[in-house]
Structure formats: C-alpha cells, structure tokens
A protein has these predicted regions:
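N-terminal localization/anchoring segments of enzymes in phospholipid and broader phosphate metabolism
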Residues: 1-357, 361, 365, 405, ...
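Helical hairpin unit composed of two closely spaced alpha helices linked by a short loop
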Residues: 376-397, 402, 407
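Active-site donor-binding acidic/aromatic loop of nucleotide-activated sugar
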Residues: 428-432
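Catalytic-core elements of nucleic-acid end-processing and repair enzymes
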Residues: 439
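Short glycine/threonine-rich loop-to-helix capping motif typified by GTGT followed
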Residues: 385, 411-415
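Glycine- and other small-residue-rich loops at beta-strand/loop junctions that grip anionic moieties
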Residues: 187, 376, 410
C-alpha cells in the first residue's frame, strides 16, 4: 500500500514539474535571466554604447510623441525607462513596445472583418427609433456602427442575469433546443460541473449533425485543460481551437488574450457577460467568497451580431475556409420587445480603443446617475478625469468594486485610485460577501452596458473584448435592482480607508508606473 502511495505521489510531482505551465514558466525565466545578463554586459561597455543609447532614446521618444493614439501613461512609462536605461530601454521597446498582435494575426483579422461585413445587416428602423427615443445615445450608437462596427438592433428581447448560476440555468435548455448551430467562445474553460454539462450537450449536438464550434483562450486555460484539448474535442465532432497559443518566448503578443465570452444558439439566442465556463462562476466551488457576476441573454437580431463577432474570429483562424454568411448566420426572427440593443467587439488589432471610447461616451452623457460595477479599476487619465468631472457637475457617480481580492497586487493598484475619485465626490463601495466580477454599467436608467470589459489597461488596450449596450426597456429595471442589492451588501469606502502610509503610497506609485507596460 505504501509503495503504491509513493508511486502516486511521485506521478503527481512529475506531472506538476513537467506540466505545460511550469515548463513555460521556467523557460520564460531563463530568457529573462539571459536578457538581464545581456543588460549587465552592456553596462560594462557603457562608454562604448553611451552615444548609441542616447541616440536610440531620442529616436524612440520622438516616435512615441508622434503616436497620437497612444495613451500618455504608456508614453511616460517608456520615457522614464529610456532615461534610466537608454540602451536597454530601447531594446525592450523594440521587443515589447507595440501592444498590437503580431502582423500576421492583424492581417488575418482585418481580412476576416472585411469578409464578414456583408453579414452585418443594418436596421434603419431601429436607428431611427433610437434617434427619436434618445438623440444623445444615438450619437454613441453611430460611433459604434462606424467603428465597432455593429448596428443597433430592434426586435431583440434582452434578459439580465444578476449571477452566473441563473444564467447557467437558462443556458442548458437553450443549448438542448439547438437545431442548427452552437458557437461558444470563452476566456476560461474549467473541468467541472458547469463545463461538463455544457460539453455533453455539445457532444450530442455535434453527433446529431449540428455545426458546433468552440474557441477558448490558451492562457486562460493553461493550467485548466490538457494542451491538446481542442484535438480531443474534435474527436467528438466539435470544431475547436485555442486562441494565441502560449509559447515560452518573451514577447508582448502573449498579452493579447481572447477575453470574450459568447454563446450563440442557431444565430437566434445569445449569452454574454462576465461568466466564464468554470464552476466558481456559478458558485459550485468557493474561491474568494461569493462570486458575484452578471450577464445578458439576447433573442433576435442582436444574437446574430454576437454570432458575427464569433465567426469573424473563426475566419481569422481559418482564412481559407469557405464561410457562407447566409448559411452560417441564418436570419434571426424578430421578437416583441421594448428595448434596443447594440452588441459590439473591441480588438487591439487597430489603434481604435472602442470600449474605452464607449465608456467615455457613457460617462460624458450621464446627467443624473452613473453606476459602475468593475472587478478592477486601473484608470488612464482620460477615464479618471471624466469620472471626476461627472461627479463635480452633479452626477451621482457610484463605483462598486470587490471587497475580497483575487489578485492582491491588482487590488492594491485599484484602491490607489480611490482617493482621487472620492475627493471629487465619486461614491465607492466595496462588495463584502466576496469577489465582484460583474462588468455592468447603468446610465440615468436609460442605457446599460453588460459585457466582458474591465476598467484596466489590459481590457481596454490589449485584450479582445465584447459587450452589449441596451437602450431603454424594462430590462433596465432588473439592472437597477441588482445594483441596489450590491450596494446593500457593500461597505462605503472613505478617505480614511485609503490611508496606506509612506511605503504603501510609494508601492502604489510604482505599480501605477509599470501598469501601462504590462
């Protein structure tokens, strides 16, 4: 018995040591050590490289200044690095200065966008209805139409979910009722009850001849799924791939993650929001207390827009694969509804920060109330200034953040912004029962945003994201009630709560300096 136990322990240790995440981490550390050794060697020859380093720093600084689409925080962080380490900073910038995906991926995504453009059907009646209903919101919708690029959709019923478990309960019958296709895209897929039930339905539907496709992010699932999980799904008839495979090479392209969460059934029903496909998101397992999330269900033409986003990604992966928009995106049946919706996607491929610009629009058009749920609050100057100004002009601005952190360093960084906001009159609440993962906005009880976008640099500049704007309708009452419940279970943050002492303040300042570079 003891011998068998030792073998079991040894097998587990070997599996851990040679696991993909450990091997990748070790190789990355070795490359970091090599870079450090190179920089140390360059320091010994500073007198030979000094002039070259200064010239390189000047060129890099001028190049940064010319980039009008680059946020000032990003420029400042790099310029400080150039000043401290002229030669080394220039090398690092050449390696990691461009936050966009690799050139090949950019070109494939751009071609896929063009290929899927004919399937994005405008709804002139919905656009006209929004113009009559809310002219200011119609301007935001026009921006999204041109740069999202996604139209406003009428005839789309929307249902809001205040947690992952209620959303999951509706996912299962929708999946079981699929007749044509199922598309699933998720940042995280974790083995357990949630994914187990979904996967079994997908397997059955694929066996019945339906078009079943799955996209998952490789980094998000690095420690959760076997490295060949996409191949394993393909043996079940499920077409699948992992996005942006993690390789043990130090480059910023690995930061471009697919953070989207989309499920589309028959092009008619769609789910999206903050909920990944793992058990903590439906509170079957406890990680950081109660996991508070949000999501939305669309039925009608708005679901087809999310299918378009999914298939654009698919087309980028398989550019030579024929994609008949009329077949793969059947016309959605309009539903009786009292709201308009506008799903949209954001991508680091271009230099258009769509999600950030939409959020700036929502802040600037708020007249009475602006309520925001976000798990992370790492703001650039544009967002920080707009939130402060909104509070100063009399808008009731409330921000709900987690009381229990999932990442202590990010939690510290989030709280470093609290004093600036509180002094301007913004109210901040800390959700005490657990981790608040919802990404929900409510503006004047007339517009809501529900999706995957966090208020941090990674979501706004590095990740592939998606969200839905909901204009009017009774569904906004459900959003408002959920936010009221969150506030009841939260503690109001005061300036006294934000005192960290000299070293805490210094630590936060360093974190804010490096945040744009990560």
């Amino acid at each position: 018995m003891k011998k068998r136990n030792w073998r079991l322990v040894l097998r587990r240790v070997l599996n851990l040591v040679f696991s993909r995440i450990v091997v990748t981490g070790v190789l990355l550390l070795l490359q970091a050590f090599w870079l450090f050794a190179l920089f140390y060697w360059l320091a010994d020859y500073a007198k030979w490289f000094g002039g070259v380093g200064i010239a390189m720093s000047v060129i890099m600084c001028l190049a940064l200044i010319r980039q009008d689409s680059t946020v000032p925080e990003f420029k400042i962080s790099w310029m400080i690095l150039f000043s401290v380490m002229p030669v080394q900073g220039g090398i690092l910038y050449l390696l990691w200065g461009d936050k966009r995906p690799a050139l090949g991926l950019r070109h494939r995504l751009e071609r896929a966008e063009d290929a899927m453009a004919p399937a994005r059907k405008d709804d002139p009646d919905a656009a006209a209805a929004l113009q009559r209903q809310d002219p200011r919101a119609a301007l935001t919708a026009r921006y999204l139409h041109d740069y999202g690029p996604m139209p406003v959709c009428g005839g789309t019923a929307a249902k809001y979910y205040p947690d992952g478990q209620s959303m999951f309960a509706d996912m299962l019958p929708a999946l079981q009722g699929a007749q044509h296709s199922i598309y699933v895209e998720s940042f995280i897929i974790g083995m357990g009850e949630m994914w187990g039930q979904i996967h079994e339905i997908l397997r059955q539907k694929a066996a019945a001849g339906l078009d079943v496709r799955v996209i998952y992010d490789d980094a998000g699932c690095l420690s959760l799924l076997p490295h060949n999980y996409a191949e394993m799904m393909r043996t079940d008839g499920i077409r699948a791939f992992s996005f942006n495979r993690c390789v043990p090479v130090l480059n910023l392209v690995m930061n471009n993650r697919d953070h989207r969460k989309i499920m589309v059934i028959d092009g008619q029903i769609a789910f999206t929001g903050g909920v990944n496909l793992a058990d903590e998101y439906i509170n079957k397992i406890v990680r950081f207390g109660y996991w508070k999330d949000s999501g939305v269900r669309l039925e009608g033409p708005g679901a087809a827009s999310l299918a378009n986003i999914f298939l654009t990604f698919w087309k980028a992966k398989y550019p030579d694969e024929d994609l008949d928009a009329g077949c793969d995106l059947p016309a959605a049946v309009p539903m009786e509804t009292d709201c308009l919706v506008q799903p949209f996607a954001d991508s680091p491929v271009d230099r258009e920060a769509v999600a950030k610009n939409v959020y700036l629009e929502l802040i600037n058009q708020a007249q009475q109330r602006l309520y925001i749920c976000t798990p992370y609050l790492i703001l650039d100057n544009d967002l920080l200034s707009c939130l402060r100004l909104a509070a100063k002009r009399g808008v009731d601005v409330r921000i709900y953040t987690p009381g229990v952190p999932d990442k202590p360093t990010i939690y510290q960084l989030t709280r470093s912004y609290f004093p600036h906001l509180l002094r301007a009159g913004v109210k901040i609440y800390s959700y005490t029962p657990g981790f608040l993962h919802a990404k929900t906005w409510l503006v004047d009880d007339r517009i809501a945003a529900v999706g995957t976008v966090n208020l941090d640099y990674r979501s706004l500049y590095l990740h592939f994201e998606n969200s839905v704007l909901i204009y009017g309708g009774a569904v906004l009452d459900d959003v408002r009630r959920d936010l009221a419940e969150i506030e009841k279970e939260s503690a109001a943050v005061t300036l006294a709560d934000c005192r960290t002492g000299f070293f805490g303040t210094l630590y936060s300042a360093v974190l804010r300096l490096v945040a744009p570079l990560c």
